[in-house]
């Protein structure tokens, strides 16, 4: 971004005004970085002072096609001129078109639209219960599936769960991640589903052992429990395929999606196979599958296809991990990931890396205390990756 995109007015005064208003009016639930961002393009964002940052957070793995991709922007603008919202009491052409598109890229027959990742997990849990007539769940330790009450029932981290106990589902059993036998032992006659992230995101970019998910699939088939994959963070090219399930050759019964689905526009969805359906009136969403969201999502899918971002995610991810592994540091435990979903485990809390990188014009964040999460837009360049690695090597 070479153009001057700073709004008029003194930047310091504008910064102070934002911080003051946020402190006064917004519930202070977020541990924010001391940045007020104003614009973004591709893999770069700009703050109100005009400083640019290579963005390896990407709205938390949302901006896969890059910030403000012109195809997505134009699609939203065009749709906004015709129809913004009508609710699901009526049909719209664009929702039907995106439903067909989503069924095609997921390889699943039925979809339901919502607005966020947590909503998609809630919908998946409800669907599992209604499809099986059972109520219990098996989930993994270090899992993260959302902060709404239902999703918290299958989210492991006590910091998120404990203030809101008891959970909606008190019948959730947590087992070690990547331990299929533990899942077998945990499934009961009342288990509706096993819910897993194919790669754990918030838990530390944890990749399961080879064969783990296939074995879980076999166990679910044997016991009659459904298998839910939470692909909220791993979907839409993040790991180098449309969905991470393709990396492991395993097909879930239900899949939750959000984050990158709308190219930065809020949207969520679940997909399921025939025979696993809600009945009329069993679930609903006022805004789910709205015209603007579907326009953005169709545009996002188009960009991923036309710009070959699945292949680019693999290529840039391999390049990024090779460069990271070559850093001259003695405090890096491991570099791991798939595609452009990368974790760098450090021997100690990684907060200082986040602060140093920000000061040097790179945005990263920690997932778990000691793992740096790098999830840049899939359009990131090798030159930008080189800059990021140079900064992290100096931290």
UniProtKB/Swiss-Prot annotation:
Q: Which residues bind N(2)-acetyl-L-ornithine?
A: 147, 285
* GO cellular component terms, A-Z: cytoplasm
Keyword Cytoplasm in record: yes
Catalytically driven reaction(s): N(2)-acetyl-L-ornithine + 2-oxoglutarate = N-acetyl-L-glutamate 5-semialdehyde + L-glutamate
Q: Which cofactor does it need?
A: pyridoxal 5'-phosphate
For the protein in the UniProt heading, the enzyme class is: transferase
Q: Name one GO molecular function term.
A: N2-acetyl-L-ornithine:2-oxoglutarate 5-aminotransferase activity
Q: What is its main location?
A: cytoplasm
Question: What are the subcellular locations of this protein?
Answer: Cytoplasm
Extract the Pfam families matched here.
Aminotran_3
What is the UniProt remark on how the cofactor binds and its stoichiometry? Binds 1 pyridoxal phosphate per subunit.
Metabolic or biological pathway, per its Swiss-Prot or TrEMBL entry: Amino-acid biosynthesis; L-arginine biosynthesis; N(2)-acetyl-L-ornithine from L-glutamate: step 4/4
Source species, domain of life: Archaea
Keyword match Amino-acid biosynthesis: yes
Q: Which GO terms describe its biological process?
A: L-arginine biosynthetic process
| Binding residue positions for pyridoxal 5'-phosphate | 117-118, 144, 230-233, 286
Cited InterPro entries: AcOrn/SuccOrn_fam (IPR004636), Aminotrans_3 (IPR005814), Aminotrans_3_PPA_site (IPR049704), Class-III_PLP-dep_AT (IPR050103), PyrdxlP-dep_Trfase (IPR015424), PyrdxlP-dep_Trfase_major (IPR015421), PyrdxlP-dep_Trfase_small (IPR015422)
Q: What is its EC number?
A: 2.6.1.11
- In the record, N6-(pyridoxal phosphate)lysine modifications are located at 259
Record text on subunit structure and interactions: Homodimer.
Kindly give any further remark recorded in the entry.
May also have succinyldiaminopimelate aminotransferase activity, thus carrying out the corresponding step in lysine biosynthesis.
Please state which protein family the record places this protein in: Belongs to the class-III pyridoxal-phosphate-dependent aminotransferase family. ArgD subfamily.
Q: What is this protein called?
A: Acetylornithine aminotransferase
User: What is the species of this protein?
Assistant: Methanosarcina acetivorans (strain ATCC 35395 / DSM 2834 / JCM 12185 / C2A)
The gene designation is argD
